[in-house]
Amino acid sequence: MENGAEASDCDSDETVIEGSVTENEPEDEELPWRRLLLNQDTTCRSEFCFHSGVDGMQKGIHSPEIQLGLKLRKDSQEQNNKNKLLLALSEDLVLQDPQDKTAQNQVLLQTTKEFPVFTVSFPHPEVSWSHQNTGGHEAENCENLPHSKKELRENSDSPEVSLLSGTSPVAPDLVALKERLTEPVKTLAVPNTLSEPGEEVTQTMTSKETKDEESSLETFVSTLEKLLESSECTQEERLLEVMDDFNPQELFSTLSNSLGSVSVPLNAWAAQGRDELENKADAALPAKLLAAVNTGADVGPSCQGQEKSSSVSGGNGCLAVQPIMSQVDEDCTQIAQNIEDPKPFRLQTLTHENAISYEQINKKKNSDPIKNTSTQETPRVLRRSSRLEKLKASRDVVHTEAVLKKPERILSNTLSFKDQINSIFTTDSFSKRKNMHSSGFKNEQIRKSEQLRKKNGTGEMKKMCLCTINRRNVFGENLLYKAALHNDVDLVRCCIKNGENVNQPSYDGWTALHEASIGGYYQAVSELLKGGADVNVKGKYQITPLHDAVMNRHYKVAELLLMSGADPLFRSDHGTCALDEAKDSSMETLLMKYIPQQKKCHLSAQRNSTDPAHVEDMFQNKKPKLSSNNYTEFICDENFDRQEPGHLEINKGSNNLLMSKEYVCEHCQKDSNTTKFGKSNLNSVKNSRTNVSKRKGQKNRQQKKTQVDDRDCNLSQKIGTSSFRRTNKLLTQQQHAVQTLSDLPEESFELSTTTLSSLENGIGYNEACLVSKKSDTHVLDSSDGQELESVDQTEAASVSELSSYKEIKLLPVTTHQQPHTNQEQYSSPYKSLGNNSSNEKGKATNKWEDSFFSFIKGRSADSDSDCHTLDKSIASPKEGMSHDHHEEIMTGQEVDSQQRLSSENYFSQENDLKVHPLTTHPQEEAVNFCDSNLISVQHTPDYKNCLHEISFGNSYAKTEQSSTSCTRPPSTQKVSPLTVEVELLKGLQDSLAHRDSSPLVNQAGIHSLERKQDTDKNYTKKGPNTSSSSRPLPTVVHSQVIEITKAEKRREDLPGNEPINNTDFYSTDINKELANSSQLNQRKEKENVRKSDAELTHNDSEAERTLKSCEEKKKNMDSETHSPCDIQEHRKDQNFRKRKCSLKAPCSQGVNTTGIGKRNKKGESQLHVAARGGNLSRVKVLIEARADVNLRDNAGWTPLHKAASGGFDDVIIELLQAGANVNCENIDGIVPLHGASAGNHLKAAEILLEHGANPNQKDQKQRTALDEADDEKMKELLKSYGAIESTNGEKRNSTDLVKIPTVQPKRYKQFICDNDKAIGSPVPSHKAKKSESLPVHQTISAILQDIEEKQENLLKLEIRNSEDEEQYIGKMLEIKEVMDNILAQQKTERDDLAKKYRVSMESFKHGALREQLANLATRQKSLLVVAKKQKKIRLKIQNYKNATAVSGVGLRKLPCNSDISSDKKSQEPPTMGDSAHAQPGLLAPVSLAYGSMQEIPLSPEIESESQKINICLNAEAIRREEFSGNDINSKQNVQDCTLGGLLRSKPTDDAEKIASSSQPAALTPHAENSQAEATVKGCGFDSSALTGTINISEDKSIFSPNGACLAADPHSQKLSRCNPKRRNKKTASQQPSAGAAEPLPQAPAVLDTYTVHQTLPCLRDSAAAASHTDSTQSSLSSASAHQHPTKTVPHRNTTPRKKAVQLKDLILRGRINPGNNILEFKTQETTHRASVLPSGKLKGENGQIYQNPVTWLKELLGGGSYVTWNYAWNTVTYLGRELVKCVSEEAPMSAELNPPQLHQPHLSAGTSRESMQTIPHYLQIKEILQISKQELLPCHVMEQHWKFYVGRSHSEALLSW
């Protein structure tokens, strides 16, 4: 026995449950009841162990029960004393004779019915069961003992007493105790764990009731109850306290390890039925049980005396109540929840134990309560992943089989967890039991349970140690994993907070995120993702959580994963991504939102190439579905034969499809009675998509099948129409198409039966199943040795069921529109049932029909390997239709075999054709079904199709020839897509209106329309049918093809594809087709190019006529015609392909080039007509034939006008590429952009704008394209390209009135500026036409060259008389007007560049802006040369006037100048006549930089006025903040003032104004860092050019003649009012008023040649300064004289007061930049930071906006604090630097804006230095060194150096270097 005990301990591989104690534990940890029974003095603890039963197991076999030990807290002395009080009672209970014990047990049982609280264990640590005695010798039944020699001695050590429930199983090592209500006999079950297997110790004790025993038992129970109630915490609390240290291995611990601990569930005593013992005398087992033991049969628990039972189980029979334990994991980690039941501790069993009970109960068919539980869901007591249930079940099967083989095994009656809960809470007996408890105990339990919930819900979880969280069970699942599995969000959050690894996978590879995703637990998934879970974690088979969420249709979880970065295109080992797993359009749409746009094209092509269901999903919400209960009426014979179910098994390498389907075959007799076929049950057979790699594991999708019901309803038969098609992971779309037939003549029908027509890979029948009475099983094997590449391929098969035919008379069709010269033959290697032939080869499809062909995208289109053919019966209103398509896969062998076929006949179909004497054809039409985006089902009444019928061969027991034909795909040959589309007659359109959801409309396919050419012939069967034919016989389909699309555009990576060059399909997205081409197809495409042009092209004129006629027919089509694709879109795609084809073979189009220039009565050429109609192919051909793209019709319209007005984008692009003028005008001044804008053709307008169209060009009505636009999108598009609103345009025009003569010559036209803005400059018409097609830069350069030529001619002209003088002046003014407009354009372009520079400084270092800046500088240089010559011209006429001494000639001869500036006349004072004239003797030499200037007079009034204007504008420039509309307007006002004075002075001032206006344009490139750019480009500015500009502006007033009228005082006052506050800043010398101006010695305007070359300012510091200089220099054009006395005002520093400077000023001047937290204000306590906004305002840390730093500091320091500007700007720092320093650095620049006194030349006597303007100091930079960013110091280091050098003088800084 001792050896046995040792063996038992060694065999156990499980740890002990908390609360149970091993033999080697310390003395204080031993079980207290064991010590209590043995009268030991050690400190006792009460242990209460409860379980469903004691099931003794074999050695090494885990116990199938969960033992949950409950350890009471050590209540030292109080608990020990209470246990001692029970000692005597316990000894009496155990040591008395068996009879007394039996009586006591009975009394105890009856007494404790009202107190079913706990199970009491009496374990003995030292004494094994073999040494324990439970009764006398008379209670022993030796017959049932395996070892009869073992005797239980009375005075041996006391064994543990176990009072078990009636449901306790009698195991090999267990003696079951059973009771009966009428005769309460107790069986004491004592496990003998150390005995050999199969041994059983059974003892029966006859009960003899005695009052003493009863009283002793009552005393025991009451004492025990008091003990329990007096404890400080409930048993549940004590159980939860030890859960953290619980070992998961103890869940499987055997009884041997528990040392005989046996449970006594008091609450279950009265709940059990009593088993009647057959032999009361010897207390033996009942006969039934003995028989079961001896024979090894399985005997269920006996449930007798249920009616008499007063147990709480009520009508539930034999009930074993399990405890309601809340969330106990496999490792016994407790997830605390409240146990509301007053009887919380019940029995609990494992799942597999219940499963065994169910199995045995079902075998024995026991009582109804047990039967009910067999159908219940197995309780998931132990938390397992749903993926691992099979693994657990397989482990349990081995264990179960070993247990069931034992004859001694009697399975217990166990109920499911759900049933037990229901039995407790729903039965009436539960209420009785509830009342039996004392209210105090119940309230105590509830109260403490709530406390436990709060305690464990917060504190316990937070205190969980990491070892507990990371503990993993046998499946590798940790606590977080199981919490996610059960959607315990709190526990998930707690585990993550305690440091759990959220990406820890189980042994099977699954993570907690996988489990939460597959369950759809949104909160759990969210917590896991917040905790750092990898959203793309790969589980088993590379499956991501997104796969699980999508497959289970958890939309919110899927969206959460996608938002967290889940990849919807990641493919698992099965080759499927999450998008493929989508089961409905909603999920698919959700996934598509998170797919990058660049991948959608490729993805769509892939999906559509293999998934016809995807196409159907796109239209399922657009078309109503037919009900599956539609019925078909059919006329046939009453006697019909039914084919028995046939089984089709398709064996593929990685996927098998087994179809069991009943094919109903009706045999119709000629003399048949009417038979109505009832409602059809339409079932779909679902098959999973074939994958390249074999699928493994639990994620494998099972192929599903559905049998079509075949029923008889009186004389009716239900016809099952099934639709087989490919699905993406259970994505199944059922298509139903049933049409009601009636009133069909009997003789027009012959029975056709269901025929499986398969494609490419040999999945097909060699013979049709017609009226077969036996079931045939066809095993069709596809090639096993080859696997397709990369992506899944689909299977396609078509079955036409029960289709009737009716001969319908075809209407005659004209054949003049069907040329027979150019035809294409489409042949398909279908297996022929007979001799196939084509009776007509001259039929072609018209172009309009071709435009509605759907192109097969991707690999399925031209690969000839992945096709889905739907042989569909399209019936008239009197015709039945059914369809059934299967899926098949193409193999490389089939591709190779197909390559041996004729490449010309790449489309073929197997139709047995016959020629009937009548013009009839069967009404059943075969429609090809292939993957595509769209469906084209067009009904053209006048163009009938030669329809391909479905050939049903081998009419059973009937004629060999039949009007029905069977389309037979080959089983070994490759099949190209069958391109046949139904062209219905006009009379049948109404009947098809209600069939919107029919497969014809609902399934996208490639449809080839055929036209009936001969009315005397049609397609019928020809020759007898053959039962099995494997040779491919092509059926030629003729179709007129306008262009050929290369196969490489539509095929993908299928090896061995035969190139197809005559494809007649059109895709809705040519880009996707191009993207999906493969190298293999490109290599094979080269072979197709060699084909003759005769096969590829057709007569273009005939095609055009056909297209036009079809378009007219299309407009008249019935509204019910279904065309999901847009007509115009198809036409565009078609035109695109035409153009591609025309590029390859333009001469083969057959266009007559001799009549290209021929015009119609409107003056339109062929190109005009083609462009107007949007005929891209014809436009392309005409362009290739060198048609004039700029040819104008009678109204001045060009082909581009026509195309733009019609919105034909492709034609517009073609014309522009051919050289069409984008800005060509008609006689009304309308350009193509006007037409596109008026027609709201957004795409056309965008194309025109991209090619240089001017959005501001006006017609004769002064309307721009923006004025013509009505659509907001069109307006936004035009504005984005620089279009200006009409109000702005009016302002601009009113300003230009000053510059342009009042009567503008008609020969002048506008020209286009560089920034797409019209300036309205008058250019000679011949020059305008010449420069229209040239770039803007070249256009202006050409204009300047033309001006130079005119200037040379003027200089050569001799002025002899007044007529020559007038002619001279007129030409000079003409040149001046052109130059003025060019200057205005230059200035506008300069301003735009300045704005762009402020936005992005880096953009000027490269790209278009850099080139634009260089072009602007080049044009400016040319303009300066022209201005210099213009000055010479003015000097010439001035010298002539001076020489003739006729001073007033100039004014009398030029009245137009006053007319031009008539708006300024009102400002002229009455003293205008008192003008001073300069004397010729006052001329002094003026030294100019160029050395070419002559001596000219200098009026002091003019000089004074010029100085005043300059000072005023400089002062105003300081306050300028940005380039805004107000700024531009103010500059225009200044310019108007200067122009007024200039034009009133004399005509010779024109060149001065030009020169002065050119100054700003010359300075602008400097502001934009043009020097650096020019240096890089190698074309730097010429210093002389800039110097000349300044010299001209300096000396603009020199050229005033003696008789020139000087400006009056009000004009100068207006200029001085620019900024009244700064009048005192003027530096001009003012002289007293006098009748005539005093002569002033001339001052030589000597400027250093290098001065301007040295004026390259820093970009950031001079961007705004350049604009101010622009205004300053432009003001020099004023020649007005000031007549009031003037005083010389000494030079003053014009630095603005610091208070006037704001942050916005500093931002505009580049001193500071907007940013976040860049301003700081430090106090003793903290540092406050603020952000600077672009508007100059501040944003504090609290988000509040402040106007300036002063208000910010007031808020920080308190509302009552007074903050001055000086304090704020001295304490607030910008990046560590005080703001006041930024202002102080700005002061020198501001001062330099005023005329400095540096570099003044030597002046004559009487001339003050302040009166001369010089180059500002900041423009004297000699060179700029550009360095790379790598050479720059870090910001903080550079800031330190900068502060150091700023604080030192210039000399000290130089010394420091």
From Swiss-Prot:
Per the record, GO CC terms? chromatin; nucleus
The biased composition feature labelled Basic residues covers: 692-704
Task: State a single Pfam family of this protein.
Answer: RAMA
Tissue-specific expression: Present in meiotic cells (at protein level).
User: SMART domains under this entry?
Assistant: ANK
Q: Which PROSITE patterns match?
A: ANK_REP_REGION, ANK_REPEAT
Here the segments flagged for biased composition (Low complexity) are 1663-1683
When the coding gene is removed by deletion, what phenotypic consequences does the entry describe? Fertility defects. Although female mice are fertile, they display fertility defects faster than wild type in advanced age. Male mice are infertile. Defects are caused by delayed recombination initiation. DNA double-strand breaks (DSBs) distribution during meiosis is altered because of reduced selectivity for sites that normally attract DSBs. Spermatocytes have altered DSB locations and fail to target DSBs to the pseudoautosomal regions of sex chromosomes.
Keyword field: ANK repeat, Chromosome, DNA recombination, Meiosis, Nucleus, Repeat
Polar residues: compositionally biased ranges: 195-207, 676-691, 814-839, 1023-1032, 1555-1570
**Gene3D superfamilies in alphabetical order:** Ankyrin repeat-containing domain
Q: Where are the ANK repeats?
A: 475-504, 508-537, 541-570, 1162-1191, 1195-1224, 1228-1257
Where does it live in the cell?
Answer: Nucleus; Chromosome
| Annotated spans, Disordered | 1-30, 195-215, 676-711, 813-844, 995-1038, 1046-1065, 1075-1137, 1457-1479, 1540-1570, 1609-1640, 1663-1697
What does the record list as GO biological process? homologous chromosome pairing at meiosis; meiotic DNA double-strand break formation involved in reciprocal meiotic recombination; positive regulation of meiotic DNA double-strand break formation
Composition bias, Basic and acidic residues: 1008-1019, 1082-1136
Say what the protein does. Answer: Required for DNA double-strand breaks (DSBs) formation during meiotic recombination. Regulates the spatial and temporal patterns of pre-DSB recombinosome assembly and recombination activity by acting as a scaffold that anchors REC114 and other factors to specific genomic locations, thereby regulating DSB formation. Plays a key role in recombination in the pseudoautosomal regions of sex chromosomes.
- Which protein are we looking at? Ankyrin repeat domain-containing protein 31
Organism, scientific name? Mus musculus
